[in-house]
Amino acid sequence: MAQLTCQNLCAGYDGRPVLQDLSFELLAGDYLCIVGENGSGKSTLMKTILGLQTPISGRILTGDGLRKNEIGYLPQQTVVQKDFPASVREIVLSGCQGRCGSRPFYNKEEKQLAAEAMDKMQITRLARRCYRELSGGQQQRVLLARALCATQKMLLLDEPVSGLDPKVTAEMYTLIEKLNREDGITVIMISHDVAAAVRYASHILHIGDTVFFGTRADYLQSPQGRLFDVKKGGDIQ
């Protein structure tokens, strides 16, 4: 049974579609990279999956035990967010807010979940540090740990390596791949890095004048894949 199904989706702003007639489905444990030119609708799709935006038409359905409030989200950071004056532990714990309901405090289980998420992201030693004092790569690990507190089923990542140097980028990709491969978490990631998409993803959704959805192997043989020369490591600008 599909964990996420997109049926004939039309999405956009003020009634003006950015995406039209988009359909695909993902199973639990899939790793989807969404690629395409700027303005093609990648972030619009992600916001619609999260329920932050209402479709113009069509539907997004969850299944296989996934509820819409069980999707973890790592958005692109703003300048203000990067300067947020809270401890690493406080930020990671805030990912448990959806589990608290009307309860105004975190319980033992939620604190343990945050501790485990920090351990997976290898940031336990930073727990008492102020978030705004961290490097960009460390901040992204904190936000990924926060997203993990919201779900053990599906993560949505909006360009999680944007602005990071090559070494830190490779480390982030490795952490994300490990969550997918070892923990079975479904990953949906927006990326401009086609080479990385082909290296790590099980499926690729290429949004542009024409749309491709399929496996990594099929993408390599598609017109979109050949256009960006992914076999040599292409980049969509």
Spans of features found by a protein language model:
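H-loop/switch region of ABC-family ATPase nucleotide-binding domains
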Residues: S191-H192
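H-loop (His-switch) and adjacent beta-strand-loop-beta switch element
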Residues: H203-R216
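Conserved ABC ATPase "signature" region
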Residues: K108-L126
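Conserved ABC ATPase signature
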Residues: C130-L134, Q138
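The feature captures the beta-strand-to-loop junction immediately N-terminal to the Walker
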Residues: V35-E37
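Helix N-cap at the start of a conserved alpha-helix in ABC-type nucleotide-binding domains
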Residues: P166-V168
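Catalytic Walker B motif of ABC-type/P-loop ATPase nucleotide-binding domains
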Residues: L155-D158
